[in-house]
């Protein structure tokens, strides 16, 4: 197994960490977490696993092969860099750059730039055949300053934010103010252990955000909504991204016209802009957890979001699910979402 590290989002850090682990697990990669730092996860796993993290993750930013980790002081960094065989890493005549990311207040901007230059010089002393290229290098070395440490290695993949930005609710042809953002939806798809070619259900599909994120990683997506307008809008949005859902059906989430699915991801309606058909959010959550239970096999997962005040963990456990984890995502002053993951027992 290779020594790897991942720079994860600080937006919802616990979600980011759980998403990374879920991707490795659902794709069948054994791993050992060696250290969890602020926005940085060090672990040992097959380096091939990075391809799946890059393909699937919403909240991972950079994937890298670790070369060294040391205290974030000049002497320790110089010693660690001088002990690293850069000449065997950089091919003859190849170019490289060094980039340093600072997390929170663990460093200053000036210190970060100074460290980039310092490490560049140390690498050139070791690999005299190499050249620096800051615009289009053959290799990028990335360092993360966090928790008074420098985690340093070769960048293998970077997840660009632009595709997720292009799939924001207001960028889609059919918009509704209650729609979830694409990053959180993708993360929930991953937490539900959605596999390629597996069947994922969103019984409150709304504008189709979850269906889009599931389809983009090769999952067969089924959407259900009680409103014809929303079901048609979801179809319109998937078509906009050239995606074909398994099915989008107008039906009541409490009376699902299905016999089996592999996982469930959903964000039931709540708030002033959502249509709850005169039912309380707690009643809706209870109803959908009851109905989807009949569709899932033992060990299969549901990832569901609801207002923190609902107490979704208690509802799920009372209905016989095993509660695996919960995360809390602040939305605005009157709403903090609880993202809960359950397993059918």
Where are these regions (language model features)?
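Class I S-adenosyl-L-methionine-dependent methyltransferase catalytic core
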Residues: 1-62, 69, 76-83, 103-115, ...
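Phosphate-coordination loops involved in phosphoryl transfer and adenosine-cofactor binding
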Residues: 92-95, 197
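Short secondary-structure capping/junction motifs at helix and strand boundaries
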Residues: 95-97, 124-136
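A broadly conserved amphipathic alpha-helix scaffold signal in soluble, globular proteins
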Residues: 117-124, 190
């Amino acid at each position: 197994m290779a020594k790897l590290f991942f720079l994860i989002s600080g937006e919802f850090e616990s979600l980011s960490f759980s998403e990374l682990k879920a991707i490795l697990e659902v794709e069948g990669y054994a791993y050992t977490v060696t250290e969890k730092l602020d926005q940085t996860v060090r672990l040992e796993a097959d380096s091939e696993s990075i391809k799946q993290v890059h393909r699937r993750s919403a909240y991972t930013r950079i994937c890298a092969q670790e070369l060294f980790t040391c205290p974030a002081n000049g002497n320790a960094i110089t010693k660690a860099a001088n002990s690293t065989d850069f000449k065997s890493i950089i091919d003859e005549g190849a170019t490289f750059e060094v980039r340093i990311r600072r997390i929170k207040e663990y460093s200053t901007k000036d210190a970060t730039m100074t460290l980039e230059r310092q490490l560049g010089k140390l690498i050139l002393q070791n690999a005299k055949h190499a050249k620096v290229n800051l615009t289009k290098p053959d290799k990028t070395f990335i360092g993360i300053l966090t928790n008074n440490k420098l985690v340093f290695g070769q960048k293998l993949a970077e997840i660009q934010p632009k595709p997720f930005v292009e799939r924001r609710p207001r960028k889609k042809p059919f918009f509704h103010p209650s729609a979830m953002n694409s990053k959180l939806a993708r993360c929930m798809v991953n937490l539900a252990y959605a596999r390629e070619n597996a069947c994922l259900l969103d019984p409150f599909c709304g504008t189709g955000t979850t269906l889009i994120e599931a389809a983009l990683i090769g999952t067969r997506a089924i959407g259900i909504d009680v409103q014809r307008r929303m079901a048609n809008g979801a179809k319109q949005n998937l078509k906009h991204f050239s995606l074909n859902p398994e099915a989008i059906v107008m039906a009541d989430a409490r009376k699902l016209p299905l016999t089996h699915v592999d996982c469930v991801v959903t964000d039931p309606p709540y708030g002033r802009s959502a249509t709850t058909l005169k039912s309380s959010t707690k009643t809706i959550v209870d109803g959908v957890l009851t109905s989807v239970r009949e569709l899932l096999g033992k060990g299969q997962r549901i990832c569901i979001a609801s207002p923190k005040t609902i107490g979704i963990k208690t509802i799920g456990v009372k209905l016989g699910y095993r509660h695996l984890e919960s995360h809390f995502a602040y939305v605005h002053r009157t709403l903090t979402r609880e993202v809960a993951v359950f397993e059918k027992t």
